[in-house]
From Swiss-Prot:
A motif (MIT-interacting motif) lies at residues 208-218. This is Charged multivesicular body protein 2a. It comes from Xenopus tropicalis (Western clawed frog). Keywords: Coiled coil, Cytoplasm, Endosome, Membrane, Protein transport, Transport. Belongs to the SNF7 family. It is found in: Late endosome membrane; Cytoplasm. Gene3D superfamilies: 6.10.140.1230. Probable core component of the endosomal sorting required for transport complex III (ESCRT-III). ESCRT-III components are thought to multimerize to form a flat lattice on the perimeter membrane of the endosome. The gene is chmp2a. Probable core component of the endosomal sorting required for transport complex III (ESCRT-III) which is involved in multivesicular bodies (MVBs) formation and sorting of endosomal cargo proteins into MVBs. MVBs contain intraluminal vesicles (ILVs) that are generated by invagination and scission from the limiting membrane of the endosome and mostly are delivered to lysosomes enabling degradation of membrane proteins, such as stimulated growth factor receptors, lysosomal enzymes and lipids.
Length: 220
């Protein structure tokens, strides 16, 4: 059928064809307008020539031709402007048609995605995922408890002893630093010779020094 009657043109092809016809018409009008403008210049020159020769009747006739020619030039300018406006409208239609085709493609793609994304199946997958995650968490917790029961007691006891020793060492250093700054009346305390890890001895020396200072105050 296309071979007999010809292929049916698409809207975009028809728009391009009309656009080419309008551009051709504008070029032809430009050529005609230029011819009229050249003729206008020639009439003006002839009017000046006849006026110098005193042939006023001829001047009046050519003046009418000049007015008529200028009107034609103006009409060609107006017609070209109208054709250009139509050409711009056709260009706008082409742009809108291109936009419509793009939106049509996007719509088809969205419809395809909506058909593929079946909500019940996705919900089922998510529920199964949550179920398997909970099972995995439970198994991991059971394995950790079993490992802690098998290995955790001795390690915890050793770690606790290490923490206690560290705290006592730090407390002893702090008390030693404070005692070294206290003033003494009966002689200086031997703080420099204190050993780390003996906070009880440092506390006893501090109590004795404080008691001695209180006795001195009572005597005064």
């Amino acid at each position: 059928m296309e071979f007999l009657f010809g292929r049916r043109k698409t809207p975009e092809e028809m728009l391009r064809q009309n656009q080419r016809a309008l551009n051709k018409a504008m070029r032809e009008m430009d050529r005609e307008r230029q011819k009229l403008e050249q003729q206008e210049k020639k009439i003006i020159a002839d009017i000046k020539k006849m006026a110098k020769q005193g042939q006023m009747d001829a001047v009046k006739i050519m003046a009418k031709d000049l007015v008529r020619t200028r009107r034609y030039v103006k009409k060609f300018i107006m017609m070209r402007a109208n054709i250009q406006a139509v050409s711009l409208k056709i260009q706008t239609l082409k742009s809108n048609n291109s936009m419509a085709q793009a939106m049509k493609g996007v719509t088809k793609a969205m419809a395809t995605m909506n058909r593929q994304l079946k909500l019940p199946q996705i919900q089922k997958i998510m529920m199964e995922f949550e179920k398997q995650s909970e099972i995995m968490d439970m198994k991991e917790e059971m394995m950790n408890d079993a490992i802690d029961d098998a290995m955790g007691d001795e390690d915890d006891e050793e770690e606790s002893d290490a923490v206690v020793s560290q705290v006592l060492d730090e407390l002893g250093l702090t008390l030693t630093d404070e005692l070294s700054n206290l003033p003494s009346t009966g002689g200086s305390l031997s703080v420099a010779g204190a050993k780390k890890g003996e906070p009880s001895a440092a506390l006893a020396d501090a109590d004795a020094d404080l008691e001695e200072r209180l006795n001195n105050l009572r005597r005064d």
